[in-house]
Amino acid sequence: MPSVKVRVGEPVDRALRILKKKIDKEGILKAAKSHRFYDKPSVKKRAKSKAAAKYRSR
C-alpha cells in the first residue's frame, strides 16, 4: 500500500500528486477497475487476441 508522509508546511496538493503517481506506478487503480465486474474466460481471451492483433498491426 503506497503511503506519503506530508511534511510541515508542504501543500496537500503536492502530497496528493505524489500519491497518485505511486498508485499509478503500482497499478492499484487498474487492478481495482478490472476486478469490478466478472469477465468470462472466453471474453478475456477474445479481448487479449484483439489487443494482440492491434499491437501487431502497428
Curated annotation (Swiss-Prot):
One of its GO terms (biological process) is translation. Keywords: Ribonucleoprotein, Ribosomal protein. Gene3D superfamilies: Ribosomal protein S8. GO terms for cellular component: ribonucleoprotein complex; ribosome. InterPro entries: Ribosomal_bS21, Ribosomal_bS21_sf. It comes from the Bacteria. Belongs to the bacterial ribosomal protein bS21 family. HAMAP family: Ribosomal_bS21. This is Small ribosomal subunit protein bS21. It comes from Chlamydia pneumoniae.
